[in-house]
Design a protein with these regions (language model features):
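Functional-site microenvironments in short loops/helix caps that host divalent-cation chemistry
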Residues: 26-27, 33, 39-52, 56-60, ...
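Bacterial N-terminal signal peptides
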Residues: 1-10
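Boundary at the C-terminal end of the N-terminal hydrophobic targeting segment
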Residues: 15-17
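Short, structured beta-strand segments at or near domain termini in extracellular proteins/domains
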Residues: 268-277
Length: 277
């Protein structure tokens, strides 16, 4: 952890009011420990069972498909310190006329999710503006294509290349190089993240859980909302990472945890952050 923390570099972009560049941290090229082993997965299943009162995630084998623990390599890149916020996304919507985050009832109900449609209304935009009081919350109800469109706009505006991270880039930034179970260490601590264990059962302003930062300085890499990656997982699906405010346990909030969602899904539990090349 000390070695990773020493490498932390924060780049807030050009210091001018009109610059839309999100703050980033620099991640050096090189190896890191990715994936999980049996001991980590067993720990995840045990903390889930304690939270849910049953071994449901073990029975459904939630974590059995994780990458086998081992060394992986990435190049150097920078990644946004926080998830992209409603305020940041609003500049894109205003400038381009891109559809604002929302989902209609029929589409939502076609997803077959457990959350009722009424719950989506607190996150839906009106008149091209984010919900009042949620400007600093992560933007949600965005598909992977929406995230890519925001990245393309930011690229044009800043003359720097912005994109979604791939799964390994995201995982390295979220856990550091030493293979820890969570961004902060190997023990789950419900006070270090926004999850259903101790959170408000809702999104919060980004960066609130500072004690849950990763060794590289990422905030909300565990909990808050899942995050789109560019890594495909079969036809029309992409890997999402990070866990959410709706999860408890929170084995799914580990950086090694992974599952995929349809790329067109607009979910109240999925947002994104970006890599800058």
């Amino acid at each position: 952890m000390v070695a990773c923390a020493a490498l932390l570099t924060v780049d807030v972009g050009v210091a001018r009011a009109a610059d839309p560049s999100p703050a980033v941290v620099s991640i050096p090229a090189g190896p890191f420990i990715a994936g999980s082993d049996g001991a980590e997965r067993d720990y995840a299943y045990r903390i889930d069972a304690a939270a849910y009162g049953s071994p449901v995630t073990r029975e459904q084998k939630w974590y059995d498909g994780e990458r086998t623990r081992g060394t992986a390599e990435t190049g150097a890149y920078a990644i946004t310190v926080t998830l992209i916020t409603n305020h940041q996304y609003a500049a894109f919507v205003t400038a381009t006329g891109h559809p604002a985050p929302d989902v209609d009832r029929a589409t939502w109900e076609s997803y077959g999710l457990i959350h009722p449609y009424a719950r989506t209304r607190r996150y839906a935009w009106a008149g091209g503006r984010p919900p009042r009081g949620r400007e600093a919350h992560p933007v949600v109800l965005v598909s992977q294509a929406d995230a890519l469109a925001y990245a393309a706009w930011l690229t044009r505006l800043t003359a720097r290349t912005w994109r979604l991270p791939d799964e390994l880039e995201w995982e390295k930034a979220a856990r550091g190089t030493d293979g820890r179970f969570f961004p902060w260490g190997n023990e789950f601590d419900r006070h270090r993240l926004n999850s259903h264990d101790a959170g408000p059962f809702d999104t919060t302003p980004v960066g609130r859980y500072r004690s849950g930062a990763s060794p590289f300085g990422l905030h909300d890499a565990a909990g808050q909302v899942f995050e789109w990656t560019i890594t495909a997982d079969g036809d029309g699906r992409a890997i999402v990472k990070g866990g959410s405010w709706d999860d408890k346990g929170c084995g799914v909030c580990r950086p090694a945890a992974r599952h995929s969602r349809p790329v067109g899904l607009k979910h109240i539990l999925i947002g994104f952050r970006l890599v800058r090349e």
